[in-house]
A protein has these predicted regions:
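Conserved amphipathic alpha-helical segments that form helical-bundle/coiled-coil interaction surfaces
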Residues: 132-199, 210-218, 227-237
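Alpha-helix N-cap/N′ positions at the starts of helices
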Residues: 41, 95, 118, 140, ...
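Short helix-capping and inter-helix turn/linker motifs at the boundaries of alpha-helical repeat units
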Residues: 37, 161, 206-207
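Short linear motifs at protein or domain termini
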Residues: 1-128, 240, 244-251
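C-terminal regulatory/effector modules of DNA-binding transcriptional regulators
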Residues: 2-6, 69, 200-251
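Hydrophobic residues in alpha-helical segments
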Residues: 50, 126-127, 149-153, 178, ...
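Alpha-helix boundary/capping and short turn/kink residues
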Residues: 55, 105, 116, 128-135, ...
Length: 251
């Protein structure tokens, strides 16, 4: 999932070096840390529910109802929803409240084009810089993905969500040695938007996608970034074409 910056607390310069009493530690530090932890956990749950399609496009996110579903305060949920709105996963409707962002073929194409641009650029840098540890990550990630793809090809879709996580992990491993944390963070956030469409459309191309993933693994070990870029373009564009031609937009 996309890396998120955690909230920092300004240092207490006036009392630096002075030990807190045990009572003060309980009343001042623990609640703040606990509140931050609960907020982060809830944020991840809401985000995952949107990305994996458990919260449908256009679904109203009534704060009172969501408070019961997620066990969080209304103020916490409002902050989370505003944050997800800034990422484009939720739409803030002013006095009307919040709803899950809508989907469209044009939005999917734009997301896919940006993913292709970022991923192809990162592949070159990663293939040129990757070491043996990087190779190991690529091979291990591919093994996990291929195992679940084989089950999917046999008609077992019970672990589709896990397969999608492994799919992300493999593509992330391929570009993980690119040397740019900013690029990786941008790619991760964009990939989640792309993943939302994959989950909603429940698209799996079977043998072609399995072959493409295997080729990407092999090209990584051969450091053939040009061939990997070509496969990546086909990989993304063919998947988008299948999603656009499906019945996702008529649901």
């Amino acid at each position: 999932m996309t890396s998120q910056a955690t909230k920092s607390v300004a240092p207490d310069t006036e009392n630096r070096g002075k030990p807190l009493s045990r009572a003060a530690h309980r009343t001042q530090v623990v609640p703040a840390a606990e509140a931050s932890r609960v907020s982060e956990t809830t944020y991840r749950r809401v985000r995952a529910d949107i990305v994996y399609g458990r919260l449908a496009p256009g679904q109203k996110l009534t704060l009172e109802r969501m408070r019961g579903a997620y066990g969080s305060a209304v103020s916490t949920l409002r902050e989370i929803f505003n944050g997800l709105a800034s990422e484009g996963l939720i739409t803030a409707e002013g006095a009307r409240g919040f709803e899950v962002a809508a989907i469209s073929a044009d939005d999917l194409r734009e997301i896919a084009a940006m993913r292709q641009l970022l991923e192809c650029d990162a592949l070159r840098s990663s293939f040129e810089s990757g070491d043996v540890e990087w190779e190991g990550r690529v091979v291990a990630a591919h093994h996990k993905l291929a195992t679940l793809e084989k089950r999917m090809s046999a008609g077992d879709r019970s672990q589709e969500e896990a397969m999608r996580r492994y799919d992300w992990a493999f593509h992330n491993a391929l570009i993980s040695a690119c040397g740019s944390r900013l690029l990786l963070d941008m790619h991760a956030q964009l990939y989640d938007k792309y993943l939302r469409y994959l989950m909603l459309a429940s698209v799996f191309r079977g043998e072609p996608v399995t072959v493409e993933h295997r080729e990407l693994r092999d090209f990584a070990l051969e450091r053939d970034w040009r061939s990997a870029q070509a496969v990546t373009v086909t990989h993304i564009q063919d998947c988008v074409a299948q999603m656009v031609s499906g019945d996702l937009w008529q649901r």
